[in-house]
């Protein structure tokens, strides 16, 4: 009898891509296994639609894509940000129940588990109805997972963790070797209006799962992974990464060709690439400071500059209609020979290009793994979510990045804090320093090799996945 796993990713492109690529990895490693991925649509993220179309156009044997019914965006638009994903999964529970019910009644296939994104862990209730074991996928790193469990434990002990916000406190967190400054704690865990109580409820449920699968690898986060394994109150941990989509997300192939063509004309390792994720946008005054810093640095650059969502709109904007309205006067003309400002960017293809020598990143976990895989030095500029913590981990804990900022917050930047052009200039020059003079570049190169060994036969992640199969099957 064939075995079937059901995957339920959260409907954001960074979460979805990781789980689909993981499904492909599972299938490639186990010939008797099939995977069904249930995809919920999210009105804000156009990347989900484009990626979904690419999956349907280029099907993978034994991988089934099931699109859950779309719901009216009006159901979510008036809700606070932290309440959107809970609402999404609530509207889909009936459909998920029907799908699991039908699959468990098959006489030719045995459903061996449900692998749910951590944000959708409450779907465990439905899996339990059909005696289907639930496994959790953590799209962020082991350090972040350990911090979340730690804060949830403090919360359970009646400590008000929201008091850490805007404090000078340093926390001793089991998954970090260094004290963690409160200023880099993810906003959603310490903001009274940020739904922290709901998030901690997810981590409580996570402790009830059969295992936690993390997109990381032993050599990158040894301290954090070991701390999670030492905690008897946390389910077994399986680091199986880096799991990456090295073929891109199916978006804008014509634009990608233009961008890569421009890079083809640049000298090796000469271009600094700036990209801040799907939701990474800046106010006009910060955009101007970045432009001045880039120009003064003297380095060639490729800058993915995206606008925020206009009031009343529901979808992410890929680019500005008129760059001259937001950039300093004459900037585009003065830098036309050395720089290119774009909207959407084919990030993986850019990081893989020989012309790129440095990456100014928002420090989303997928971006960190991609930078390691492609031996790309990073300068940290976190924006939202857990990215401040990721930046701290990269700079202080692992020594793999240059710090522009570790505590910049686009989501709650109500104070109008601005990173000035002179600091940006200095850090870009440090980032692009020649390899012989850069300890960080040497460490990144070593970690690249370790990442590839981890995924190869008998490597740490290869072995971890084999052990996971023993548990699941």
Curated annotation (Swiss-Prot):
<protein>
    <recommendedName>
        <fullName>UDP-glycosyltransferase 71A27</fullName>
        <ecNumber>2.4.1.363</ecNumber>
    </recommendedName>
</protein>
<feature type="binding site">
    <location>
        <position position="365"/>
    </location>
    <ligand>
        <name>UDP-alpha-D-glucose</name>
    </ligand>
</feature>
<feature type="binding site">
    <location>
        <position position="366"/>
    </location>
    <ligand>
        <name>UDP-alpha-D-glucose</name>
    </ligand>
</feature>
<feature type="binding site">
    <location>
        <position position="370"/>
    </location>
    <ligand>
        <name>UDP-alpha-D-glucose</name>
    </ligand>
</feature>
<feature type="binding site">
    <location>
        <position position="345"/>
    </location>
    <ligand>
        <name>UDP-alpha-D-glucose</name>
    </ligand>
</feature>
<feature type="binding site">
    <location>
        <position position="385"/>
    </location>
    <ligand>
        <name>an anthocyanidin</name>
    </ligand>
</feature>
<dbReference type="GO" id="GO:0016114">
    <property type="term" value="P:terpenoid biosynthetic process"/>
</dbReference>
<dbReference type="InterPro" id="IPR050481">
    <property type="entry name" value="UDP-glycosyltransf_plant"/>
</dbReference>
<dbReference type="GO" id="GO:0035251">
    <property type="term" value="F:UDP-glucosyltransferase activity"/>
</dbReference>
<feature type="binding site">
    <location>
        <position position="15"/>
    </location>
    <ligand>
        <name>an anthocyanidin</name>
    </ligand>
</feature>
<feature type="binding site">
    <location>
        <position position="362"/>
    </location>
    <ligand>
        <name>UDP-alpha-D-glucose</name>
    </ligand>
</feature>
<comment type="pathway">
    <text>Secondary metabolite biosynthesis; terpenoid biosynthesis.</text>
</comment>
<feature type="binding site">
    <location>
        <position position="386"/>
    </location>
    <ligand>
        <name>UDP-alpha-D-glucose</name>
    </ligand>
</feature>
<feature type="binding site">
    <location>
        <position position="367"/>
    </location>
    <ligand>
        <name>UDP-alpha-D-glucose</name>
    </ligand>
</feature>
<comment type="function">
    <text>Component of the triterpene saponins (e.g. PPD-type ginsenosides or panaxosides) biosynthetic pathways. Glycosyltransferase that catalyzes the biosynthesis of compound K from protopanaxadiol (PPD).</text>
</comment>
<feature type="binding site">
    <location>
        <position position="347"/>
    </location>
    <ligand>
        <name>UDP-alpha-D-glucose</name>
    </ligand>
</feature>
<feature type="active site" description="Proton acceptor">
    <location>
        <position position="15"/>
    </location>
</feature>
<feature type="active site" description="Charge relay">
    <location>
        <position position="117"/>
    </location>
</feature>
<dbReference type="InterPro" id="IPR002213">
    <property type="entry name" value="UDP_glucos_trans"/>
</dbReference>
<feature type="binding site">
    <location>
        <position position="387"/>
    </location>
    <ligand>
        <name>UDP-alpha-D-glucose</name>
    </ligand>
</feature>
<comment type="similarity">
    <text>Belongs to the UDP-glycosyltransferase family.</text>
</comment>
<dbReference type="Pfam" id="PF00201">
    <property type="entry name" value="UDPGT"/>
</dbReference>
<keyword id="KW-0808">Transferase</keyword>
<keyword id="KW-0414">Isoprene biosynthesis</keyword>
